Amino acid sequence: MTNRDDELAVLTRGLDQASTLLGSVGDHDLTSPTPCHEWTTAELVDHLVAAPAKFAQMVRGEEVDWSGPTPHVGDERAGAFRAGADELVEAWHGVGDGDAPMGPDWQSAEIAVHTYDLAAAIGHPTGELDPEVAERGLVFMKANLTPENRGPVFQPEQPAPEAADAYQRIAAFAGRTVTPSR
């Protein structure tokens, strides 16, 4: 297996677990706050659902508009996410080495951070998630996300609790305030 194959295998697992987590979101969860202070759970869900299809566009070398409003997906959140996730994995299988702007670890980082956000918002223990997704994402973020290029999306790194799991560590690096697990 090549490094990209390893990255894609981890991304696929991250997409699978995010899909499962999205399937557990109930209507009663949608107004809950998230670690992304500017988003409710409904807004986070919409962003998370839209991300894989946009990543697939990037992998294929297409122009992506991240600034536009994200459409609301309603009750079809897990199915819509799964369709985008499948499109993303297919896009990766269709490009040669070096033809994409970055490898799958970048998308694993994004998926891991927002999986943390969603898990925290709905009370799902992050210790039950696949740690390798967050660990690979964190390695990628530490190598590529500097204080100078964080922009408005990522706040400055926050301290992680002493016994933080992989998702808490990546969330803290991405600027989320993380509390110790219970």
Where are these regions (language model features)?
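Glycine-rich loop at the start of a catalytic domain that most often binds anionic cofactors/ligands
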Residues: L48
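Extended, alpha-helix-rich binding/interface surfaces that flank or overlap catalytic cores
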Residues: L44
